[in-house]
Design a protein with these regions (language model features):
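Bacterial N-terminal signal peptides that target proteins for export
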Residues: 1-10
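Short, well-ordered helical secondary-structure segments
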Residues: 7-8, 41, 145
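C-terminal motif of bacterial Sec signal peptides marking the signal peptidase cleavage site
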Residues: 16-19
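Immediate post-signal-peptide N-terminus of mature secreted/exported proteins
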Residues: 21-83
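Generic signature of mature, soluble extracytoplasmic domains
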Residues: 65, 69-107
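Extracytoplasmic electrostatic interaction patches
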Residues: 89-90, 94-177
C-alpha cells in the first residue's frame, strides 16, 4: 500500500510533464492554424479581384494610347491634354504593375500554405517539444504577414486605379472624338 502511495505522486508529476509538452505543441499548432486562416483569407481576397475588368481596361488603354499617338496634335492641344494624358499613363501603369503582382502573390500564398501544412504536421506528429521548429514558425509568421500586407496593398491599388481609370478614360475618349 505504501508503494502505491509513493507511485501516485510520481505518476501525477509524469502526467503533468507530458501534458506540458503536448500543450506547448498545441499552442504552436494554434498559431499555425491562425496563419493558415490568414493565408486562406488572402487567397479568397485575390480570387475576388475581377482581373477580367483590369485586363479589359488595359486593352482599352492600349487602343486609346495608340490613337493618341496616331493623331497629329499641335502644341496647344498637347498642353491642354498633358495633365489628363499624364494621369492616364500613371493610372494605366499602376494597373498593369499590380495586375502582374497577382500571379506572384498567388504562388507565394500556395507556397505559404504548403509550408504551414508541413510545420503543423511536424508539430502534430511530435510527442516532444519541438524547439527546432520554432525558428521556422517565426520565419513563416513573418512571411505570412508580409504576404498579407502585399495582397492588401495590391488589391487596394487595383481598386483605386480602376476607379480612376473609368474617369480618366472618359476624358481621354472625349479628346479623341
Amino acid at each position: 500500500m505504501k508503494i502505491i502511495r509513493i507511485n501516485i505522486p510520481c505518476l501525477i508529476i509524469i502526467i503533468l510533464f507530458i501534458s506540458c509538452y503536448r500543450n506547448y505543441n498545441a499552442e504552436k499548432i494554434t498559431t499555425v492554424l491562425e496563419l493558415e486562416k490568414i493565408t486562406k483569407s488572402d487567397v479568397s481576397a485575390l480570387q475576388k479581384v475581377n482581373i477580367t475588368d483590369v485586363e479589359n481596361s488595359l486593352q482599352i488603354a492600349k487602343l486609346n494610347l495608340s490613337k493618341i499617338e496616331e493623331k497629329k496634335l499641335d502644341t496647344i492641344e498637347i498642353r491642354l491634354i498633358y495633365f489628363e494624358y499624364h494621369n492616364y499613363l500613371n493610372c494605366v501603369n499602376k494597373l498593369y504593375e499590380n495586375s502582374q503582382k497577382i500571379n506572384t502573390l498567388k504562388n507565394t500564398l500556395a507556397n505559404n500554405q504548403v509550408q504551414l501544412k508541413n510545420i503543423k504536421s511536424d508539430y502534430k506528429n511530435s510527442r516532444e517539444r519541438r524547439g527546432d521548429l520554432d525558428k521556422h514558425l517565426i520565419y513563416e509568421t513573418d512571411i505570412v504577414k508580409e504576404t498579407s500586407s502585399k495582397v492588401f496593398n495590391t488589391i487596394k491599388i487595383i481598386n483605386e486605379e480602376q476607379s480612376k481609370f473609368d474617369d480618366l478614360n472618359s476624358k481621354i475618349e472625349e479628346i479623341l472624338n
